Amino acid sequence: MQQLIRRSESIERAAWSNLYRRAPWRVRRRLGLRVLDRGEATFLSASRVDHLLLNRAIGVGSDGVAAAVGHFEQRGIGRFWIHMGSELRYSELPGLLRERGITPYPRSWMKFVRPAAPLDEVKCALRIRPARRNDGAQVGEILARGFDLPTEAGPLLAAGIGLDQWDYFVAEDEREVVAAAAIYTRGDDAYLPFAATVPKARQKGCQRALMAARLGRAQQLGCRQAFTETGMPVAGEPSSSYRNMLRVGFDELHVRDNFAPEGCRWHNLPSSDAIAKSAASPRPSGTWLKGVVLSGS
């Protein structure tokens, strides 16, 4: 079990680092992308996008708290996650984070694993095919909207199209791309980082079909297991993604707790000028010991 947990963390770090580093230069500059590896930890930051998903620290231990918080603080980023595996709940790490004003986020994540084997009984009226480079704009827009990111972040999420280790698949409705999903592979492991469907194409089997396509590709490449994650169920909030993972054969692997500056919440950044607004917004300065409270939904 612990080996699988380590593998799931490792391939997630590798996939997102790969995407940040290999995105086109203009995208890296536009979003303020940076990746910093510190021992077993990886810091992913997008200084011009005020969104939790693109500003995260993975694999931080007790000796890495100062470096992780300092990375985001020095880059002027006030909204970020520091991920912590549930096995560290009773270590000194939570206390060290709280001392810096980094507190538990309301929703933890569940990491999932399943064999890299095809799905049975996949029915979808839409056409499923591998994504092409000229699909990039549509794929990026769908994925960005699916994760409440500004449209300018779309090129980052679609940056893996055509790159080695990455495979993207799309669902078409009369030649219009209406859903997209990606898979990153490395040796025995596959990682499914994101997928999304436009509202009008939901309830048509797109995501199950895209899952089948990705798992089939993982098996074709010789992968043994596939990893992914989604938010834990929270009372009063939708949890369809969690249920869908179980329906397609994923097993719960481990809970990952998320820590963020006090008051941070997920929020929607759909507007085309969101990045300009983010870049112009004042940022908190000084240490987090003062208990900075950030606005958000």
Q: Where in this protein do the model-derived segments appear?
A:
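Short amphipathic alpha-helix that is part of the acyltransferase structural core
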Residues: 1-18, 56-61, 108-111, 115-155, ...
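Acyl-donor-binding surface of acyltransferase catalytic domains
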Residues: 21-22, 60-127, 132-134, 228, ...
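A conserved beta-strand-loop-helix scaffold within acyl/acetyltransferase catalytic domains
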Residues: 149-199
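A short helix-loop-beta-strand connector motif used in the catalytic cores of GNAT acetyltransferases and
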Residues: 27-34, 76-78, 105-108, 160-170, ...
